[in-house]
Amino acid sequence: AMTNIDRKIMTLTARGIDCSKLSKYNNGEPFIDAKGNKVDDLAAVLYNYSGGYTINGPIFALNALDMGNYTIPENAVWTREKLLETILNHKYLSDGFGLDMVTMLMQSIAPYQNDPVYGERVKAKLWEGFDIVMDSFGTDPFDNPFGVQWGGVYTSEGASQIICALSAMGVDVHTDVRLNNGKDSVLTSFLNYADFDEGYFAHSNTTPKNAMATYQGCYATQWYLGFLNGGGAGHPYS
């Protein structure tokens, strides 16, 4: 699947590995994948992918290729232009993945806000997503005013993805008046899921010590810290 290649590149790139020349890490020899294929340039495997996909495939592909600033040739199956066009033309909430895919889509295109070709479309898409995020918050101010639900349950993963998306587009999830009611904010709502003594994030108020919630919570934290330290929009890897 396209997303499997995306994840491999993001994981390896995050560890400082150049996925366009894997033989550097194997005594000059390409690696052999599970199907017996020799793989030296994993980035090329991704941008020349020709199989089926759902929208998360192009979204994560753009993230993966941008993480390592990988060069994509003009004759690739998936150029950056094609990835951007596919993502920008995707209708929010039409994929069955809910709010999480809205915010993941926003994360992928946010670095292109000032692009001379795509910038205006990117900004419009981001603010459309922002409105969807705002509409998703709880309506009971005494319940969880900045929480988001999945299957009727407030989850930390949803909060994590919102923090990443809004930080990427340059919106402060703690101080922006639209995201802070004077008592709570998107950030404080997210931190309610953190167990600082045990060092984990809970999935929900009734599901503690969750692995997925913890790693998403950690990179959302890193994303917000990157936003603060970098003085505005952007990815933590930029």
Which positions does each model-derived feature cover?
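Intrinsically disordered, low-complexity repeat and linker tracts
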Residues: 231-238
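A residue-identity detector for tryptophan
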Residues: 47, 78, 127-130, 150, ...
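Alpha-helical repeat scaffolds
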Residues: 21-46, 73-88, 119, 123-130, ...
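An alpha-helical repeat/solenoid feature that recognizes helix-turn-helix modules
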Residues: 1-21, 48-74, 89-125, 138-177, ...
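HEAT/HEAT-like alpha-solenoid repeats
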Residues: 43-51, 84-92, 131-138, 188-195
